[in-house]
Design a protein with these regions (language model features):
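N-terminal Rossmann-fold NAD(P) dinucleotide-binding loop
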Residues: 13
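A short alpha-helix-loop-beta-strand transition element characteristic
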Residues: 35, 52-67, 112, 169-173, ...
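FAD/FMN-dependent oxidoreductases across multiple families
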Residues: 117, 226-305, 309-310, 316
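C-terminal helical "tail/cap" subdomain of flavin- and related membrane-associated enzymes
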Residues: 307-471
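Generic enzyme active-site microenvironment
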Residues: 29, 154, 276
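Predominantly flavin-linked oxidoreductase catalytic cores and closely associated redox partners
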Residues: 9, 102-248
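Glycine-rich FAD pyrophosphate-binding loop
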Residues: 5-7, 21-40
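A conserved beta-strand/loop capping segment in the N-terminal third of enzymes
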Residues: 46-100
């Protein structure tokens, strides 16, 4: 009987393990942190709820309103009028645990362990031996163990050890930084079904910042390319300031950071080793979405293993596994390319960002955006809509090029009046805890002992992502 090791217990690894175990294949699922709380916007599209049979209990909020805020703080509201449609907001620790446990219930061996080394054999064609530290006993040091397997699915995130073992090649990464800020009930009511996206060089020179609602707190974060990593805390302070009028009574309960892949790796299958999720580089440009594509890639890879192994009775070849890559690229390659083009156009400077937010005020653009995200499908348009969208896009490009030198500066938001904010600050209202910023950049914010700070860099941390469709 075929034996498969799935390294990494996030959405991609768990969904792969579920398919394999359900087919009766001996499946070992490795995850170092079973309480994984990866920094991630936590947005999932509506189609994922049905496609992956997710219960409503894991969805904290059903977002039907998205507010886009431009560099000058112009606000554009995008609404989902159909009450059956929504963007699901979840906590990664809840979603990941559900998917892992479902795979285990179907027969996958769930190992609380960290894979430290992989022997790949001659020319990486096997046999494959995993060296790992087993933490099942609860001891801090763990117990060293080995396991020989026929195939390996690498679902261990951007810092993938499996990718290194198979010489998959490097890729550029972005850095996602996020604070979880707990708000009193009267403030959380504002975010009942609302998420916010902010654009501007003050919050990210090449991405966007977000305020996404969770169960009893909001995730407030930003992302930028690795070359700008030294700026990340200043950018986080930028989104704090832009969104401050709704966060003044908040308290930071966790600070998180994580790398995000910017494009697929050069090699995603070598021998009988295959990469999925963040390890493979399946995060979309422009939106940073990763959860759905992680889960989908894990499932597609596992389905190919089941099919090519005749249900586990034979060992698939490298050529067999590469069929999964061909199917993936055919299905989603155009989506990744289009979103990369859009990022290059609309995130190039603040003038282009301003034009982009204005575009989002158009109802046809809103419907196109939401349908594409919610259902992961290409939305057809009539000739008039196509012409209008083309003109709007060209206008944004021209405006971005013409106005870029002038430079935009944020203006006060209209969420609360200046008088209201002054009154709140007079009685000591302020965000408590969180990041520390250099004295030369922005005012520092002390980190209280009660705040939990998590900088995630481990090899078995899974998919990421700030996500909307907008990880």
């Amino acid at each position: 009987m075929l034996r498969v090791a799935v390294v990494g217990g996030g959405p991609s690894g768990s969904c792969a393990a579920e398919v394999l175990a359900k087919a009766g294949i001996e499946t070992w699922l490795f995850e170092r942190k079973l309480d994984n709380a990866k920094p991630c916007g936590g947005a999932i599209p509506l189609c994922m709820v049905a496609e992956f049979d997710l219960p409503e209990s894991i969805i904290d909020r059903k977002v039907r309103n998205m507010r886009m805020i431009s560099p000058s703080n112009r606000e554009v509201d995008i609404h989902l009028d159909n009450q059956d449609e929504y963007i699901g907001m979840c906590r990664r620790e809840v979603l990941d645990a559900f998917l892992r446990n479902r795979a285990a219930d179907l027969g996958a061996h769930l190992v609380n362990g960290l894979v430290t080394k992989i022997d790949t054999g001659t020319a990486r064609q096997g046999p494959y031996t995993l060296h790992y530290t087993d933490y099942s006993s609860g001891e801090a040091t763990g117990e060293p163990r080995t396991l020989e397997v026929d195939l390996i699915v690498g679902a261990d995130g951007a810092n993938s050890r499996v990718a290194r073992a198979m010489d998959a090649g490097d890729y550029n990464v972005a850095i996602a930084f996020q604070e979880r800020i707990k708000l009193p009930p009267e403030e959380m009511a504002y975010y009942e079904d609302l998420a916010e996206m902010y654009v501007g060089t003050d919050v990210s020179p090449d991405f966007y910042a977000w305020v996404f609602p969770k169960f009893d707190h909001v995730a407030v974060g930003t992302g930028t390319m690795q070359k700008n990593q030294s700026l990340i805390k200043g950018l986080q302070q930028g989104i704090r300031e832009r969104a401050a009028k709704r966060l003044l009574k908040g308290e930071v309960i966790k600070v998180e950071a994580h790398p995000i892949p910017e494009h697929p790796r050069p090699r995603r299958v070598v021998g009988r080793m295959a990469l999925v999720g963040d390890a493979a580089g399946y995060v979309t440009k422009s939106s940073g979405e990763g959860i759905y594509f992680a889960a989908k890639s894990g499932r597609m890879c596992a389905e190919q293993i089941v099919a090519s192994s005749a249900g586990g009775s034979r060992i698939p070849t490298e050529a067999d596994l590469k069929v999964y890559i061909k199917k993936w690229d055919k299905l989603y390659g155009p989506t990744y390319k289009v979103l990369e083009i859009l990022q290059n156009i609309f995130y190039s400077n603040d003038a282009a960002r301003e034009a982009f937010v204005e575009m989002c005020d158009d109802k046809d653009v809103q419907r196109l955006t939401f349908d594409s995200y919610l259902y992961k499908r290409v939305v057809t348009m009539n000739p008039w809509q196509q012409l209008k969208l083309t003109c709007l896009t060209l206008g944004a490009v021209l405006r971005g090029q013409a106005l870029a030198p002038s430079g935009y500066r944020p203006v006060p938001s209209a969420v609360r009046s200046a008088a209201e904010v002054e009154a709140m600050e007079a009685v000591g209202a302020a965000i408590k805890g969180g990041i520390r910023t250099p004295q030369t950049a922005r005012p520092s914010v002390p980190v209280p002992e009660t705040s939990s700070v998590t900088i995630v860099t481990g090899t078995q941390e899974e998919e990421r992502e700030p996500a909307l469709a907008g990880k």
